[in-house]
Curated annotation (Swiss-Prot):
Pfam families: Ribosomal_S8 (PF00410). SUPFAM superfamilies: Ribosomal protein S8 (SSF56047). One of its GO terms (biological process) is translation. It comes from Methanothrix thermoacetophila (strain DSM 6194 / JCM 14653 / NBRC 101360 / PT) (Methanosaeta thermophila). One of its GO terms (cellular component) is ribonucleoprotein complex. This is Small ribosomal subunit protein uS8. The gene is rps8. One of its GO terms (molecular function) is rRNA binding. Keywords: Ribonucleoprotein, Ribosomal protein, RNA-binding, rRNA-binding. Part of the 30S ribosomal subunit. One of the primary rRNA binding proteins, it binds directly to 16S rRNA central domain where it helps coordinate assembly of the platform of the 30S subunit.
Length: 129
């Protein structure tokens, strides 16, 4: 039974990276997964990804670059303010300026660095480094 599609997607990416596969398939597809993959692609952690319609919920085909050491979701999805970002960075990232927290904000899904620059908080979704 699939309870958290985003957690399943991050687990699939992490396992495929650990084995050294050049690409992976993420099922089922959702808008939240698409926005999270876009943030990861913009930051250079993954290559291109494309949506494949299979007549059901769809799937994503993701090109892997071998740049992810670890990735995962943050549960429960804590609501944080801008001032609390550093506390959560220390908890989930291994070093300062290494890796990224992915947040869902009122202005869309973005990395924590963009949220800090814009001065907005949001809900923690995932971490990647």
């Amino acid at each position: 039974m699939l309870l958290d599609p985003l957690a399943d997607a991050m687990s699939t990416i992490k396992n495929a990276e650990n084995v050294g596969k050049p690409e992976c398939i993420i099922k089922p597809a959702s808008k939240l997964i698409a926005m999270t993959l876009k943030v990861m692609a913009d930051l250079g952690y993954i290559g291109e990804f494309e949506f494949i319609d299979d007549g059901k919920s769809g799937m994503f085909k993701v090109k892997l670059l071998g740049r992810i050491n670890r990735c995962g979701v943050i549960k429960p999805r804590f609501a944080i303010k801008v001032a609390e970002l550093e506390k959560w960075e220390r908890r989930f990232l291994p070093a300062r300026n290494f890796g990224v927290l992915i947040l869902s904000t009122s202005q869309g899904v973005m990395p924590h660095t963009d949220a800090r620059a814009r001065g907005i908080g949001g809900h923690l979704l995932a971490y990647v480094y």
